[in-house]
Amino acid sequence: MINSAKGRLVAFDNKKNLELIGLIFEADGGDKENIIIHVHGNYGNFYNNKFIWKMSEKYLNCGISFLTFNLSAHDGLCEGYRKGILDYVGGAVSDYSESILDIEAAVDFVKKAGYEKVTLQGHSLGCDKILEYVLNHNDIEKVILLSPVDSYAVQERWLGIHKNETVEEQLNRLRKLCKSENGILQWLDLNEYGAEGLNDDWIYKIPVTTKALLSILQGSAFKFIKLKNGVDFLVDKETYVFLGKNDGLRMCSLEDMVNFVNKHFTQCYVNDRMACDHDIIGAEDALINDIILWYKK
């Protein structure tokens, strides 16, 4: 059994009036100086990854508050509410760009609660989303990237195996298909999107609708953390990057990924020492202890 710290459920709305729900864990003593906001990955949520549970305890023990919340793109397909009116949300149907509004809403929520120094922490596709936010906002103190991957390369490999198609060809085809749908919620076949990882633990199909996949392919996940011909960028915030040695979704060598992040993050600390997978299973305590050492330095 894994225990978490004692938190309280919170809710806040993004600019599209979608209610976002999460858990906040506040450090004792009334200190509202430091907080880490966790942004989950593709089809994830605020509680599923067990390292989140351990962070809630370990961060609090060090005087760091912690917020973990559901993006509009959480899970696959879920019921959400916009000003009390039902709307279907989730990774399979939501527009990728709304996740950036979700992050903005979370930052505004903790700022209004009195927190002064906000750190954004992303896992997997959450790394791409917080990166886009940081590149367009100047209200973040530090950045934590857990298992960032080249999503373009992952989809490129998937399409080569399952569709005999390039990402650009898929994009053009989906754009035409999207124009013909006229607002219909159109589910694609299961060979359109997925991961053909470099080990058996990371091979899976991802159900998705046309508009949602098109928004992902055209979003920041396919632009910035892209080792071949990606959009150039530079982040000058203090940044912690975790790269597990056995990450089956990393489509390049560990050395190439380390070089990439060192090039694009000017104040970067890279932890590439741990022999664990994309979800950091079995190395949670060691990772969190290392993050805290970096954070407190």
Regions found by a protein language model. Name each.
Residues 1-30:
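N-terminal cap/lid segment of alpha/beta-hydrolase-fold proteins
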Residues 132-136:
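Active-site signature of alpha/beta-hydrolase-fold catalytic machinery across serine-
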Residues 28-76, 80-84:
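Short, surface-exposed "cap/lid" segments of acyl-processing enzymes
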Residues 144-154:
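Active-site nucleophile loop of the alpha/beta-hydrolase fold
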Residues 88-112:
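Alpha/beta-hydrolase active-site loop
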Residues 12, 176-296:
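Serine-hydrolase catalytic core
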Residues 121-126, 130:
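Gly/Ala-rich beta-loop-alpha elbow adjacent to hydrolase catalytic centers
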